[in-house]
Amino acid sequence: MNFYKIFVFIALILALSVSQSEAGWLKKIGKKIERVGQNTRDATVKGLEVAQQAANVAATVRG
């Protein structure tokens, strides 16, 4: 029973120390994912602008 308490205590301390050290690593991955999302959004907006301009040109040509 005493061994179980010591094991849980050591596991808890180890989990806390590992989670604090990996926070930077997870933050970097989160920022990369956020950057991909921003690039996708920007590309979609530009694509919609080009499509709208093409539709305007087609409407102008048709009269």
Swiss-Prot record:
Q: Where in the cell is it found?
A: Secreted
List UniProt keywords, sorted A-Z. Answer: Amidation, Antibiotic, Antimicrobial, Immunity, Innate immunity, Secreted, Signal
Q: In which tissues is it expressed?
A: Hemolymph.
Pfam families in the record: Cecropin (PF00272)
What is the top-level taxon of the source organism? Eukaryota
Q: Which residues carry this modification: Arginine amide?
A: R62
Decide whether keyword Secreted is in the record: yes
- Per the UniProt entry, the signal peptide is 1-23
Gene Ontology CC terms: extracellular region; extracellular space
Provide the induction entry. By bacterial and parasitic infection.
Outline the subunit composition: Monomer.
Role according to the record:
Cecropins have lytic and antibacterial activity against several Gram-negative bacteria.
What is the protein name stated in its UniProt record?
A: Cecropin
